Amino acid sequence: MVEETLSTEQTEVETDATLQVRDLHVYFHTAAGAVKAVNGVNFALKKGERFGLVGESGSGKSTIALSLLRLIKPPGRIEGGQVFLNGVDLVSLTEEEMRRKRLDEIALVAQGAMNSLNPVRRIRDQFMLAFQDHGIDVKRSGINDHIGDLLSRVGLSRDVADMFPHELSGGMKQRVCIALAISLSPSVIIADEPTSALDVVVQWQVMDTLRRVQEDLGASVILIGHDMGLMAQFVDRLGVMYAGRLVEIAKVKDMFGDPLHPYGQMLIASLPSLEVKQDRLQGIPGITPSLLNPPSGCPFHTRCPKMMEHCKTVTPVLQEVREDHWVACHLYEEAK
Amino acid sequence: MSTPLIEARNVTKTFGGGLFDKSRTVALEDFSFKIDADNPSVTSIVGESGSGKTTLARLLLGLVAPTEGEVLYNGKNLENLSSRDRKQFLRDVQVIFQDPFEVYNPFYRIDHVLDTPIRNFGLAKTEKERKDLINEALEAVGIRPEEILGRFPHELSGGQRQRIMVARSLLLRPKLIIADEPVSMVDASLRATILGSLLRLNREFGISLIYITHDLTTAFQVSEDIMVFYRGSLAEAGDVDQVVRNPEHPYTRLLVGSIPLPDPDMPWEGERAIGRPAGELGEVGEKFCKFTDRCPFAMPMCVQSDPPLYHTHENRVSSCFLYRESPTIPMTEMTSIFRSSNRQGPVQDNVSFDALDAELEVSTESSSSASSNDD
């Protein structure tokens, strides 16, 4: 039953897409069985677009980030689906071909990326290492200028190149990581909770930097996180993940103004604001389902206030119910 | 006015600076604060990392001793309480920490963390009393007892674990709960429920709350009064509605402008909210305003002395020379301007907790369907 729905699931058709993800499945094989971390995900990214992926912990959003870079490690495995980057299916590449794509065409700014800098190497060396890995002659003249340019593009002084990571603040290190990520002008930058360890003022600086370099480069960005405020302020389009599936995709204004999926609606309603004091503090009742044994039918039916009988058995399919507004919910099936 | 439950008097805490160590970090500088138990209040402490907010919590809990000044519990110095007073203090003042994963011993069932305070303080004489106490506390935070008792910590979500910590505090009927970043490690969708359970303790059980956070939005939602810290000093304090909607201190303005609001139509100004730092102002004196190097409004006087508290409005103070026309108020009198200090009786509002009660019903359904999935 489930298999059947998956194969007939509609895909968002984009011809001018930089990145297109089709029916992606990523499972983690544990002693207790396969954990379906990503369970049939489809989305496309236009050139220069900023796309957000939100969801609670365990919804599969970070697994998507890693699988786009083919960095899923055993017991995790990409079980099926395709990831087209500029027309090339990344899933079918060899390990060596994929290694060349990373950084060159698709780069990652990871959660707590500032801790990924080598503490005993100067910042300059960390750039050199990346260049060497991609066959760039680091002895050639002008390479230092290039590193300096990259650093000044993210708002840092050129002198930072000669410093060690411990001499920099968290926000500066995160900007160094952005400079590294853009060093080979990739067409897609994946930012997985790039500011979750930073204070709010520094968060603004880092995100402002990311937006500026992304616009300069014309690159697309996938921002992954659970901070709806950050999403509202940064992305053009937003996808909502729940239990390994994308349940809603819409332009950010539509998502915040008129969410369609009951989960999306509750998520938006639970956001605290600075405008009005809510007279009730309401989260989303219930707990996230286990991905080892996901509920049958719609994964959200165990917490959904609008649950109908067939939600328990039939998995809803992601479909476009309004222009550019996709939702996977039985409530909207008649509307179509 | 009666003796405050907890009082900090001109407290300073520095780290380092031993005999051979020249580097000295001032975590908190000359700070005074009072909590009156008869007037249940909700006060937020907000600041970035290194602002001294957690140091303040640890001082109030007696976990660290102040370098200068003193912390008093019912008028007695926290450092030399009699063992009887000490036991009463441990009951009256409860804490909820940031990490809902670390506070549980993974080898014990959830019941252990609830049984321990009952045993230590002899709260129940019979088994039935013990059960009733636990059930009542769990239901107050929207958790069905039968759903979690007998389980191990790893079987519960972060949100549930954090709410069990709230229930554990409630068992002791404390007068004050200090919650240090209680929701920062929990998913956004669960934050509101945890904060709701804390707020219910204040409204229905008359427990005062100190809510420590870096998140101005939730501080605005739950508290009456707020204190904004910057590098160990109080920048601004007072009525939370006024401070957040119309910040005075340049640091608070920067903080408010940096919050990404969950509304695509609202601006996200960040540093543009205040502008670029003013630049060189000459020799920096022994005392100076900590925010000078980032402040666009900095004047030469800002590096010559540290600004006192200016009483700018009825319910607020700002530590900034921009408000030097206003009368000053001594630090020790700071809490007298709080809304909670000037109110008779409990907070009057219409906060509803039916969301928490509804949770009890929903969780029955989901637990029954979850168990059917396990088969």
Task: List the model feature ranges, each with a label.
Chain B
Residues 4, 239-356:
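Short catalytic/signature loops enriched in Gly
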Residues 37, 69-77:
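Conserved ABC transporter NBD signature motif
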Residues 61:
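Helix-to-loop junction immediately C-terminal to a conserved catalytic motif
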Residues 171-175:
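A short, proline-enriched helix->beta-strand linker immediately N-terminal to the Walker B motif
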Residues 186, 190-268:
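P-loop NTP-binding/switch modules centered on Walker-like glycine-rich loops
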